[in-house]
Each structure stands twice: as structure tokens, then as C-alpha cells.
Regions:
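Hydrophobic Val/Ile/Leu positions in short beta-strands of Rossmann-like dinucleotide-binding domains
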Residues: 6, 30-31
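FAD-site-proximal beta/loop scaffold in flavoenzymes
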Residues: 2-24, 100, 107-184, 283
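Flexible, glycine-rich terminal cap/loop adjacent to redox cofactors
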Residues: 209-215, 223-319
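Residues that mark the start of a beta-strand
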Residues: 16, 26-27, 50, 228
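A conserved FAD-binding loop/helix module that cradles the flavin
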Residues: 141, 155-218, 303-319
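Rossmann-like dinucleotide-binding cores of NAD(P)H-dependent redox enzymes
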Residues: 27-29, 35-91, 173-178, 195-196, ...
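A short alpha-helix-loop-beta-strand transition element characteristic
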Residues: 23-24, 132-136, 192-203, 228-232
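A Rossmann-like FAD-binding core segment of flavoenzymes
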Residues: 45-143
């Protein structure tokens, strides 16, 4: 059925953009509320389309905890996006071109549909070989990116990777992880013998006027892996309120009970939220506690940050 597309390559994006410029396309439905789906929502809003987002889960952006994804949902609703949560697509209808999307809860008019429901490893060609695959089809590699067959390497979204915090293998389909692993695999093919130091699932997204970032473990992951943990949420500003145009930042911190070792962090704000996640990523990578990061010598100047940065306000509030 024409008018139903996936967004996988640059060519896909160019084609869809030109298609969406047609005046008869007024209603766009996005299926999937992850990173790609949300970016599509914003793109079509900028093109003046009426946008509907259908998500099978009870919220969007599930890599973030509920408090943060809730802020993203509020931002989308404020810009006129129709959110259809807890709904599953049943079928697309139309003659030649899509005209309607049917879910388990209703029917919606649509002249264009984008399916953005995540990715899975395309490794079917390895079935029946000696290369070990995980349950989701991802290639299992050691920390040198070597598969179960000696001297055969793999890297990218087709693989599991070592998670720095949990010490377990994880499926993290992120460009940063793929680039690092690809570089390391190439070096090891040439005899470098280097090990991947581990990923944290650090990621960021722009949601209209908000920016959001996360790193390390979310609350659900901390519980899943058996951590004894605590959380705290603070609201601060990107720079001091006495300097013009301060904007609010919300930070959620997940840390180990007792030791106060930082396990994960998430941030949301209009400006300056995402880059603060990089500070937390370095801290988690090196096993820092909230006390240590809370007293780290970060920069101060009124245009950029306060004497106590939002990162440190969160850390020092952790008990």
C-alpha cells in the first residue's frame, strides 16, 4: 500500500520529505514513540501537518523513566500532537494509497504513515553457522569484538556490547557505540588486542523546544539487575537566575544505596540539559559517587552555570 514507509536510510528521508510537501497530504501518522518516531513528529509539524503518534506502550521514549518521558509527552500535546498510547496497529486501509490506520481502539484518517518501531539485527544469514547469536538475533562478541569463531569480528547494531555498569552484554543500537566498536574491531583485526571499555547507553533527543538526555541505568534497569538503589529528582536552572534568560532543567539521578555510587542520570530542559549528561557519563564510567561528583571542580560563569551547577545540586541532594 503506497504512503506507508519506514525511515532507514538518507534516501528514505529525502523521498519522504518531498512526498510530504504534497498539499493533499494533511494527516500524518507515526507508528512508534521512540527516538526516530519523535524526530519524525517534529519534522512533520514543521511542514505544517496534523500529526498523530501511535505507541503500543503506555508512554513514549521508554529508555527514559516515566517522569522524564512525561515531560516530553506534555511538550508534544502542547504543540497539537495527538497521542494514542496503549494502542496497537491492526491494519492500514486504502485503495492504492493509504487512507486509514486501524488500531485495536479506533480508526484514524492518514494520507501518510511512517513506521518507526525499533530495529533488530539482520543476522538471519548466520543461522546454522558456528557464530553464536543472542535470543534477539544479535551476534555475541567478547570485549575485543571477536565472535565465537576465532579471528572473526563483528561490530555495530548487529551485536551485543559490554555494558560498563552492569558488566553484562546489552543490545544498544546507537551510532556512538557502533562507531567505537567498528574502530576497535578494525584495530584488533590488525593485531591491536584492545578491549572495549564498555557502553552506558548514553543518548539524547530534541523534542520540539525540549532537549533530553540519559546515561547509565534507568530505574527499571536498576531494579531488573538487583541493585539496591535510590533516586532523586531536582529542578534547577541552566545558569543563575540573576543572569538574563535562565531556563529550567530537570535532573533525575539513580544511585546505589549506601555507597551512593552513581548508576544513571537523565535530564530534560530547554537549554543545557543534554551536555550535562556527558558529565554523568564520565562519572559513571569511572565509578564516582554523588559525594565525589558533587564536589568536583566544574566551571562557573553566570552565562553558563552557577557556582553550584545543576549536576552538583542533584548530587548533593542525594542522601
Amino acid at each position: 500500500l503506497m504512503g506507508v514507509h519506514v525511515l532507514k536510510t538518507m534516501e528514505d528521508g529525502i523521498f519522504i520529505r518531498e512526498l510530504a510537501k504534497q498539499p493533499e497530504i494533511k494527516n500524518v501518522t507515526i507508528v512508534g514513540g521512540g527516538y526516530i518516531g519523535i524526530e519524525c513528529v517534529e519534522a512533520f509539524l514543521h511542514l505544517g501537518k496534523k500529526v498523530r503518534l501511535i505507541e503500543a506502550a503506555d508512554r513514549i521514549l521508554t529508555p527514559f523513566d516515566e517522569e522524564l518521558s512525561g515531560l516530553a509527552q506534555e511538550e508534544l500535546l502542547a504543540h497539537g500532537v495527538e497521542l494514542c498510547l496503549n494502542e496497537k496497529v491492526v491494519k492500514f486501509s486504502g485503495t492504492d494509497y493509504v487512507q486509514e490506520v486501524e488500531t485495536d481502539k479506533g480508526r484514524y484518517q492518514a494520507e501518510l504513515v511512517i513506521i518507526a518501531v525499533g530495529v533488530k539485527p539482520s543476522t538471519e544469514f548466520l543461522n546454522g553457522t558456528n557464530i553464536k547469536l543472542a535470543k534477539n538475533g544479535a551476534i555475541m562478541v567478547n570485549r575485543r569484538l571477536e565472535t565465537s569463531i576465532p579471528d572473526v569480528y563483528a561490530a555495530g547494531d548487529c551485536c551485543l556490547v559490554y555494558h560498563r555498569e552492569t558488566g553484562k552484554d546489552a543490545f544498544l543500537a546507537l551510532g556512538t557505540v557502533a562507531n567505537k566498536c567498528g574502530r576497535l574491531a578494525g584495530a584488533n583485526i590488525c593485531g591491536a588486542g584492545q578491549e572495549f571499555t564498555g557502553a552506558l547507553g548514553s543518548a539524547a533527543i530534541k523534542v520540539l523546544n525540549l532537549e533530553m538526555g540519559r546515561t547509565g541505568l534507568g530505574e527499571k534497569q536498576a531494579e531488573q539487575f538487583g541493585y539496591s538503589y535510590r533516586t532523586i529528582i531536582i529542578r534547577a536552572y541552566d545558569h543563575p537566575a540573576y543572569y538574563p534568560n535562565p531556563t529550567p532543567i530537570t535532573i533525575k539521578l539513580i544511585y546505589e544505596r549506601g555507597s551512593r555510587r552513581i548508576l544513571g542520570a537523565q535530564a530534560c530542559g530547554n537549554k543545557g540539559a543534554v551536555m550535562r549528561i556527558d558529565i554523568f557519563a564520565v562519572a559513571i564510567h569511572n565509578g564516582m559517587t554523588t559525594q565525589e561528583l558533587g564536589m568536583t571542580d566544574l566551571v562557573y560563569a553566570p552565562p553558563f552555570a552557577g557556582v553550584w551547577d545543576a549536576v552538583q545540586i542533584a548530587c548533593n541532594a542525594a542522601k
